């Protein structure tokens, strides 16, 4: 597609920025609608001086950096902070007094806002403010602190983010003038004391999403519990990679109890992910009992569950709004999945996605689950890869999926008959059986995206895939 030639206004903006002729007095008289395009152009041309002047005189209540420019370089980032700094130090702000918020979060974040928040978040693009905003601007005192939004990540002490390091040092010195607001926080295997010092000047009630990756250290995870308790509006929690021995010391038992009891305080929690966490075994009953708010998504991956853990799913807890369930990598080989079947029946009316990949189920497990699976009529996605299911059992399931018409993504394991004694795929049999199963499915209902996949190849770690259009993807060893 041929792009439209630049307008005279575009050319004027480029020239103005390129020659760096914008002065403070010019900015004070500049039409407010010119600020966003000039800001974008100054970022494109990497003109920090112009950026600083535009920020200092920003005429809108919100400066959404993340919507205007994608990942500013370090020089531009520093210029934005310098502009904010100059704005904060101004004694009188007749025009500039409108600025209430500087937001570095990216466009993806703003795309997820609801309509009301989105309208407020895009005030810098319109010529007039909502009446409610105008009234509030006159009623607020000048002592109100500026809010600066930025997601924070402490995932690696070896590769620190220069932008974030600068921001934290800058914000720490200006806590009397601004609030550093973080809605998405990631904490990895860094020094606990370092992160705790940062948490002290954040507003915990603003944090909505938290990822904790303590890389095997249970005591580190437990030390964060007092801070997490204060995150009363936390909606999404991810506990990742905490592993150790199956024999707990007294101190470890106390830490586990402290972590599990935390869930009683998270009354807004809607999305929970527990990935590769060793202490979860025999703790599911207490954890689920502690949940106050109804979960929308529950993801438990690479964890070892006991029979009592599985039974706890079918007991009383707040699952009335559950739409997404993932048990990927949870080995069910030696467990009775009847409680899981009963649980799936109870959430069938709402469940939209189900991921049971690599649960190591066989025909007996699948036969047990089948009556529940066919009742999940709202499913849009199902993943059953890496389960040892025969052709007959899989065909029986597909034949009974008439009511699963909402499915848009279906991933099924290649039947056990496609493997030889060494568990390698026999390509001709793979293609033949998968083709027959696909035809059986098409006789039952119209499918959107269906794929039969083998287990990963021992040599290249890729799958054989048979898709609904008849396309066959061989593992790299066969190509």
Curated annotation (Swiss-Prot):
Tissue-level expression: Seems to be specific to pluripotent tissues in the early embryo. Not detected in somatic tissues.
Gene deletion effect: Embryonic lethality due to a developmental arrest during the establishment of the blastocyst.
Domain of life: Eukaryota
SUPFAM superfamilies with a match to the protein in the record: RNI-like
Repeat (LRR) residue spans along the chain: 96-124, 179-203, 204-230, 231-265, 266-291, 292-323, 324-347, 348-375, 376-400
Record's keyword annotation contains Repeat: yes
Keywords, ordered alphabetically: Leucine-rich repeat, Repeat
Single GO BP term: negative regulation of DNA-templated transcription
Signal peptide segment: none
Family membership: Belongs to the PRAME family.
PANTHER family, per the entry: PRAME LIKE 14-RELATED, SIMILAR TO PREFERENTIALLY EXPRESSED ANTIGEN IN MELANOMA-LIKE 3
Subunit and partners: Interacts with UHRF1.
Reported function: Promotes maintenance and self-renewal of pluripotent embryonic stem cells (ESCs), downstream of LIF/STAT3. Maintains the pluripotency state of ESCs by repressing DNA methylation through the regulation of UHRF1 stability. Mediates the proteasomal degradation of UHRF1. Is required for the establishment of the blastocyst.
Name of this protein: Preferentially expressed antigen in melanoma-like protein 7
Lineage summary: Eukaryota, Metazoa, Chordata, Craniata, Vertebrata
Chain's gene name: Pramel7
């Amino acid at each position: 597609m041929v792009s439209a030639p630049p307008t005279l206004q575009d050319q004027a903006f480029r020239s103005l920025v390129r020659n760096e002729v914008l002065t403070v007095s010019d900015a004070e008289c500049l039409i407010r609608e010119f600020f966003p395009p000039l800001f974008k152009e100054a970022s494109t041309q990497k003109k920090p001086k112009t950026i600083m002047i535009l920020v200092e005189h920003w005429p809108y209540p919100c400066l959404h950096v993340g919507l205007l420019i994608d990942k500013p370089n370090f020089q531009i980032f520093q210029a934005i902070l310098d502009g904010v700094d100059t704005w904060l130090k101004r004694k009188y702000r007749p025009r500039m007094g409108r600025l209430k918020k500087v937001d570095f979060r990216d466009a993806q974040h703003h795309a997820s806002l609801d309509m009301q928040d989105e309208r407020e978040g895009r005030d810098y693009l319109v010529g007039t403010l909502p009446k409610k905003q105008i009234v509030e601007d006159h009623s607020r005192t000048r002592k109100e602190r500026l809010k600066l939004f930025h997601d924070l990540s402490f995932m690696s002490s070896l590769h620190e983010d220069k932008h974030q390091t600068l921001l934290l040092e800058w914000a720490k010195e200006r806590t009397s003038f601004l609030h550093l607001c973080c809605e998405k926080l990631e904490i990895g295997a860094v020094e606990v004391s370092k992160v705790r010092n940062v948490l002290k000047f954040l507003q915990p009630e603003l944090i909505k999403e938290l990822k904790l990756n303590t890389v095997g250290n249970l005591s580190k995870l437990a030390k964060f519990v007092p801070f997490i308790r204060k995150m009363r509006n936390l909606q999404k929690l991810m506990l990742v990679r905490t592993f150790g021995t199956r024999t707990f010391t007294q101190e470890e038992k106390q830490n586990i109890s402290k972590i599990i009891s935390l869930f009683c305080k998270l009354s807004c929690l809607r999305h929970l992910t527990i990935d590769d966490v060793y202490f979860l075994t025999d703790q599911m009953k207490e954890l689920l009992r502690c949940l106050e708010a109804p979960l929308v998504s529950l993801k438990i991956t690479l964890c070892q569950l006991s029979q009592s853990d599985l039974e706890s799913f079918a007991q009383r807890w707040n699952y009335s709004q559950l739409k997404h369930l993932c048990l990927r990598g949870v080995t069910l080989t030696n467990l009775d999945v009847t409680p899981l079947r009963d649980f799936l029946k109870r959430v069938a009316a709402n469940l939209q996605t189900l991921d049971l990949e690599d649960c190591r189920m066989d025909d007996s497990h699948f036969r047990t689950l089948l009556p529940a699976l066919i009742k999940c009529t709202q499913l849009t996605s199902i993943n059953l890869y890496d389960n040892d299911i025969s052709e007959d059992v899989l065909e029986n399931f597909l034949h009974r999926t008439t009511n699963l018409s909402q499915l848009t993504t279906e991933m099924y394991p290649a039947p056990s008959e496609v493997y030889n004694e060494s568990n390698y795929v026999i390509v001709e049999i793979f293609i033949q059986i998968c083709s027959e199963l696909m035809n059986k499915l098409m006789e039952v209902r119209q499918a959107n995206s269906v794929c039969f996949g083998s287990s990963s190849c021992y040599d290249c770690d890729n799958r054989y895939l048979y898709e609904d259009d008849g396309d066959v993807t061989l593992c790299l060893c066969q190509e």
